[in-house]
Every structure is written in structure tokens, then in C-alpha cells.
């Protein structure tokens, strides 16, 4: 029986690459995103059965509609990937865009994490991967304040749930992918250019799948970022935040 995976934010970037690599491994897929045309174009190039589920996960009702669709179905893997960012001084960035970001990056992820984890635990197997960011591992992110805050939520929530399931001796895997810069259309949406060289989506997803196989709770695919995270543990918090601000300002100047 083929395995079944659900991928949100599947129309581009990391989500689309998860679809390609999982299809190559024989997974049947449900692809979720706002842009139906992109989902259909992606599915046409895949080798396994793909269901298209257009949804705007910024809306609570759409999240619950997806959950309802999944009730009673065997889920082997759920990739919680939908999300976006923004860059600029907090006093200048657009409030409506930030509230939509919080709706997608936090509320939608929270709803789907809770409801899908319940399904996985009830069926007694499966894996849930939340796509966070290395931003969520840092104390704060001046000039990307809201985005960093949303990703800190993702890392914290995922880590807590993973520990609860371990203590309950559940076979269900829960993990968080925390990439640094990845060469996708994230830049255009966030109105930013990376200060560090990005990795490819292909490499990012390979590392994610390998980390899941090893049941790592937090997966950091970029070795430069991973080294920075390790060194950052020895820095005073204010110093770390100043360094983060310096790196973020580079992005602003590149625009």
C-alpha cells in the first residue's frame, strides 16, 4: 500500500520540492496551497497520484476544512510548510500583512499541528514535520521582528509536543525543520535579500528527510547556520541581538 503525505504550502519552494522528492519515493500526495494553477502544474510532473486541495490557510475555516477532509484517512506524513515573511523596521511594516503572517505562520500551523497530531496518535503511527526557520532559534530578529517571533512559536510548540509524545511513549514522530536561507521565492514575498548564501531546496529537503529518519526534533540543514547557532549559545543575549540586527540591516541595504 503506497504511503500518503500531505504538504501545505506546496505550490513553490520547499513545499514543491518535498512533493518532488516524496513522489520519487513512491508517496501518494495531497498538495495544499492557495494557487491551484501552480499545484496542477506541479502535480503534472510527478510520478505518483496527487490530490489537489486549494485552500487559504490564513482563514481558520479553511484549516478546519482541510482537517475534515483528512478525518478517517491514513496519514503517513504531514508537512506543515505554509508560511511567509516580511522585512523592515517594525514601525514601518504593514500591519495587515503582519496579521496575515501571524494567521498563517502561527494560527494555521497551531490548528493543523493539534488536529493532525490527534489523527496520527489515534491511528498509532505517522510523522509530522513543521517547517520553522533558524530565525526561531535566535533570541530576536530586529528588522524582521514579526517573522522571527512567529518562527520562535513554531520551534517552541514543536519541541514541547515532541517531548510530550516521547514521555507518552508514542510512536508518532514530530519534528521541526529550521533552515537558514534557502533559494526560493521567499525573498520576493518578504521584500528582502539574504545576507548569507542560501542552500538549494533540493539539499534542504534531503536533509529534512534524513533528519526525520533519524528522529531529530530540530533539523538545521545549513552547516554554516548550525555552526552559528552553536557559537551563539556562548554569547550574551544583547550581543547576539546586535549581531542579528547588523545582519538584517545588510538585507535592507541590498534592496
Task: Indicate residue ranges for each PLM-predicted region.
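Conserved NAD(P)H cofactor-binding loop of Rossmann-fold oxidoreductase domains
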Residues: 81-86
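Conserved glycine-rich cofactor-binding loop
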Residues: 11-12
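C-terminal helical subdomain
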Residues: 176, 193-229
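The beta1-alpha1 cofactor-binding region of Rossmann-like NAD(H)/NADP(H)-dependent oxidoreductases
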Residues: 54-65, 95
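Conserved glycine-rich Rossmann-like NAD(P)H-binding loop of the short-chain dehydrogenase/reductase
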Residues: 25-41
